Amino acid sequence: LHDIINLNEFATYANMKVNPGEEKYYPQANGEMRYVYGENLDSYKADPTNPANYRVINYVDWQKEAYSSALSQIYSASVSGGSDAVQYYVSANFKNIKGIVENTGIKQGDLRLNLTANLSKAVKLTLNMNGSLQQNDMMTGGNTTGGVAGSLARTVLDTAPYRTPSDDPSLLDNMDAKTNVDSWKNDYDDIINDKKFNASADLLWKINKHFSYNLRAGGGVSVNDRNRWYGMTLTIGANDEGVLAVSNTDKSNYSIENILNYNVDLTKKIHLDATAGLTYDVHTFLNKNVKGTRFSNFDLRTKGLHLASIIKHDQPTQKDYQLLSYLGRVNLSAYDKYLLTASLRADGSSKFK
């Protein structure tokens, strides 16, 4: 943590910045710090004993209010076994990682399955599947403009080391004056729900001593939902009477590869291997963004989009493509010294392992 000035040091600094007679901070012999609004300065100087003319403020270390030690928990279990014909591996994991900022953290569960099966002496099948569910409750990462309106980290460093009295007139004129660490902790949500699933299969068929066939298929699905809420004690939320930004991103892909391999020794010193294949890839991407403002009720926060008076739907972003590719390659090696290669690629998408 940074070495932050205390309340007395801040009062001395703030009083030095203004003209004589306009000081707002008055430390007392008993350790009390009095804060005087600009319009009450004359009244306070005339009667400094009248509590109506000042407010007592207390020192707040915003770093300690914002950050604290966090506990992380990780649990995992796995099972493996099988026989000569079939082998399997199953694992499960759960993570509960608390953030150093209150009400932030990650919860994630994962499940994985690996299976290998010898269907015959010539055919082998390998399956891999995994999925995960994740909820990430984050704190804002800031923006390029800085200042207390941008992020908690800047608010911690830029805010005066005390809580501004609620009846301070400056709160009416300066929106940023309302924003402190409490605002970010209690009036901001950034929740991401992420779902992922991936699967692949690899079938190898050794047709004879020269030919082998490989079929690979795999794909994945990803669903990402993000909801950000700015309440009335944050500048962004106060400007629009509450702001809820909702983002949904859906991605998926799958691919199929058919590979035929040929290997032969033409002589004791000359070897030939050839590959021919066909691949097909499909990718989809869709992103939707919705923004709600002018809320009539603030209690539902990230779940209250229907309470917004103004709902703006941005133009969705969609990126889909399919690719069909052909490939071929021939390698001729001689005497373990010379190599001649010829290859054919269609669409520039061929891949060799």
Give residue ranges: language-model regions.
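Short glycine-rich loop/turn motifs
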Residues: 76, 255, 323-328, 337-339
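Transmembrane beta-strand segments of Gram-negative outer membrane beta-barrel proteins
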Residues: 1, 60, 85-92
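Conserved catalytic-core segments centered on acid/base and nucleophilic motifs
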Residues: 203, 328-334, 338-344, 349-353
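Outer-membrane beta-barrel initiation region
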Residues: 66-70, 76-83
